[in-house]
Curated annotation (Swiss-Prot):
InterPro entries: DNA_methylase_N6_adenine_CS (IPR002052), SAM-dependent_MTases_sf (IPR029063), Small_mtfrase_dom (IPR007848), tRNA_Adenine-N(6)_MTase (IPR050210), tRNA_adenine-N6_MeTrfase (IPR022882). Specifically methylates the adenine in position 37 of tRNA(1)(Val) (anticodon cmo5UAC). The keyword Cell membrane does not apply. Keywords: Cytoplasm, Methyltransferase, S-adenosyl-L-methionine, Transferase, tRNA processing. It holds the Pfam family MTS. This is tRNA1(Val) (adenine(37)-N6)-methyltransferase.
Length: 245
């Protein structure tokens, strides 16, 4: 049920079915994460992994989109963010399905024996040298903290035979990410280029990679129409989450 705007908490983001506190997280809830959480394919999945979970946004969105038997593991390096993600999960309707680990994915991954049907990540993409303000934001945004080749290799060791590894990245970075992925044996299966409006070039790209070869489906989405309202496509994708949509 929608709440009056005056009653909304200011330390996070209120969705229709859950609240994400993010005041102790370097990276706040934003459009990139919401796009990825609403877009990632979930048909038939049983186990989901969120790499670099931050506030736990993706895990909670995917919990909302999946059946009760689906379990979700979140791995986050920063202790403050991991603690907040755990609290967010505990206060959500899916507390029993979401588990948060405070760990370095590169150390955590080799210890795992189970495989995941879906892995998601909103990974760092800034090169070292860009001022991010705090060490926590640098860790969350610099590729130096988790390089894309290392991320792809870790995901490859954790993905099921027909699973998908989904990310959101800036357009140019995404093209480089695809090349790196193809070079180490991934196949691109889904791609959605995101633009603010029809008249603008895409600025983000959603990618789904798989260890299994198959046809690649590509499309384009604009966030806002000519009247600056959310587009029909963006509304259809995200209206299950946004409180006032």
């Amino acid at each position: 049920m929608s709440q009056p705007k005056a009653l909304l908490r200011r330390d996070g983001f209120t969705f229709k079915q859950f609240f994400v506190a993010h005041d102790r997280c370097a990276m706040k809830v934003g459009t990139d994460g919401i796009l990825l959480g609403a877009w990632a394919p979930v048909a038939g999945v049983k186990r989901i992994l969120d790499i670099g979970s931050g506030s736990g946004l993706l895990a909670l969105m995917l919990a909302q989109r999946t059946e009760q038997h689906v379990t979700i593991d979140s791995v986050e390096l920063d202790a403050q963010a991991a603690n907040q993600a755990s609290e967010n999960a505990a206060e959500s309707p899916w507390a029993e399905r979401v588990q948060v680990q405070c760990a370095d994915i590169l150390a955590w991954a080799p210890e795992q024996t189970a495989r995941y049907d879906l892995i998601v990540s909103n990974p760092p993409y800034y090169e070292p040298g860009v001022d991010c303000g705090t060490p926590e934001r640098e860790q969350a945004r610099y590729t130096g903290s988790l390089g894309h080749p290392a991320l792809l290799a870790a995901a490859a060791n954790l993905i099921s035979e027909e699973g998908f590894f989904c990310v959101v990245l800036p357009e140019n970075t995404g093209n480089t990410f695809i090349k790196t992925a193809l070079d180490i044996g991934w196949f691109l299966r889904l791609r959605t280029d995101i633009a603010d409006t029809d008249g603008k070039l895409p600025h983000r790209v959603l990618l789904a990679l798989s260890p299994k070869e198959g046809e690649c489906f590509s499309d384009r989405m604009v966030i806002r129409g000519p009247d600056q309202r959310y587009s029909e496509d963006y509304t259809a994708l995200t209206q299950a989450f946004y409180l006032f949509m």
